[in-house]
Amino acid sequence: MSTDRQKSFIATIGAKTTLVHFLDVVEGEEAIVYSPSFSGGFFTGRPESRDHSHFLSLRPEPRLTLYFRYTGSAYRIYIRTPGPYFGKCLSIEDGLLGAFPSDGATTFNLIDKRGFIQPIESVNTDRLDIYLQVAGSPGVLHTHRLPDSKFTYFADKNGYPHMFNFTILERNAPYLSSPEEL
């Protein structure tokens, strides 16, 4: 029987025609979204701003490197690309995929083209086309647009499934803090 470490791996992630990265990297600056303030159908003041820099989007370069840590039933996905999000986890907030602290982070299933959970130990290649599904959710991640934002996001909100491309860099990958783990 495989251990959690043996089912864990490090990979870069992309999409069919491009790669995936955080909005502040995509934009080259903070990704601020402005929403007008309305009350009772009337404009009531200055637009409210929200920083969406930590949410994922599409990007041609550089590659985003992730650590997929198996947790017994699904994967917790840690960010391994150097920068402000290193060590954080991919998680869902308000239906959008972004970088968040690891405590209570969302776990994900790898879903194959037939709609089944894909055990990584049965994959013999280092290139993998896969869907990501929030564990316990019926759907898979997809691209999503918010009405008050110019950005494209990844979401768990009932959209057309988005296939991700993984390039596996290392299998049987330990936690950074436990390199001697079996």
Question: Residues of each region from the PLM?
Answer:
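Lectin-like carbohydrate-binding module/patch detector with strong preference for beta-trefoil
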Residues: 1-182
